Amino acid sequence: MNTVLVDTSAVLALLVPTDVHHKRAQRAFTQLAADEARLITTSYTLVECYALIGRRLGLDALSTFRAEFAPLFDVAWIGSDEHERGLDLLEESNSEKLSLVDAVSFVVARDHDVERVFAFDPHFTKAGFTAVG
C-alpha cells in the first residue's frame, strides 16, 4: 500500500503561503492525492499542528484544518508503549533538537512499515525515511 507519514512541518508548509516550502508542499500534496496515498499521522503530531496553527494562523485556520485536512489522515493514537519507545529513541538519539513528537512518529512509521514521509524536517531523512516533499 502507498502509505506516507505526515509531519507537522508539511502541514504548516501547506497552510502557510509565506512558508519557504509552501509551493513544494502544494505540489507534493497534489501528487499524494492523485496517487491516492494513505496518509497517516500521530495523535501527537495533530496536537502539535493544532497548537501551532492556532497560535500562528488563528482560530479560523484551525477550524479549516480540523474540518478539511485532519479528516484526510488515518490517526495512530499514541498509547503508553509508543510513548515510552519514543522517549527511549529520543534519549538514544543524543540530539537536543529531536522532539518527542518526531521520535514517536519514527516509532509509528517503523511499526507500520512506512518508508516515505511528507515532511520538511531534516530529522526524518536523517532517520532513514524518504521525504516526498
What are these regions (language model features)?
Residues 1-40, 54-67:
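Short, well-structured N-terminal submotif of metal-dependent ribonuclease cores
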Residues 1-3, 46, 106-107, 111-133:
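Acidic, PIN/NYN-like endoribonuclease modules and their adjacent C-terminal/linker elements
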Residues 6, 40-41, 77, 100, ...:
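Short beta-strand scaffold positions
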Residues 31-32, 69, 89, 93:
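Hydrophobic helix-cap positions at the C-terminus of alpha-helices
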Residues 35-39, 72-74, 113-115:
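Short active-site oxyanion
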Residues 75-115:
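Active-site neighborhoods of divalent-metal-dependent phosphate/nucleic-acid chemistry enzymes
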